[in-house]
Design a protein with these regions (language model features):
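Extreme N-terminal tail/first-helix region
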Residues: 1-11
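Short histidine-centered beta-strand/loop micro-motifs
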Residues: 7, 28-34, 51, 75-76
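Conserved short histidine dyad/triad with adjacent acidic residue
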Residues: 17-34, 68-69
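Short, charged/polar surface micro-motifs in flexible loops or helix N-caps
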Residues: 25-26, 44-47, 89-92
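Short, conserved beta-strand element in jelly-roll/cupin
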Residues: 33-49
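Short acidic-glycine-tyrosine-enriched beta hairpin
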Residues: 52-69
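Ligand-binding loop in jelly-roll beta-barrel domains
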Residues: 68-92
Length: 92
């Protein structure tokens, strides 16, 4: 998906906080969760998410979707990664 189309989709789906970020290579983030829904599009590099006993690697062009409160750990790839991320507060 093209970045502009991804950002437009985020806005349509109520993701108000949208930014492009970079993550450094090889960093491991232990198990944690976020108070908001996250949706990200990996632009370059790769990351591996460990969630509910399973691991999945995401590369350029892949979309990551995490619901608020989902516990996960992250391992940045050997070259790090860049991504567009949207955050949405969960509906009460």
């Amino acid at each position: 998906m093209e970045p502009a189309a991804f950002e437009a989709q985020l806005k349509r789906d109520g993701f108000a906080e949208i930014e492009t970020k970079s993550a450094p290579p090889g960093v491991f983030s232990p198990v944690h969760s976020h108070a908001c829904d996250l949706r990200a599009l990996v632009m370059t590099g790769e990351l591996t998410l460990h969630c509910q006993g399973a691991s999945q690697t995401y590369r350029a062009g892949d979309m990551v979707v995490l619901a608020a409160g989902s516990e996960h750990a992250e391992l940045n790839g050997p070259e790090g990664y860049t991504y567009i991320v949207g955050r949405r507060q969960p509906k009460l």
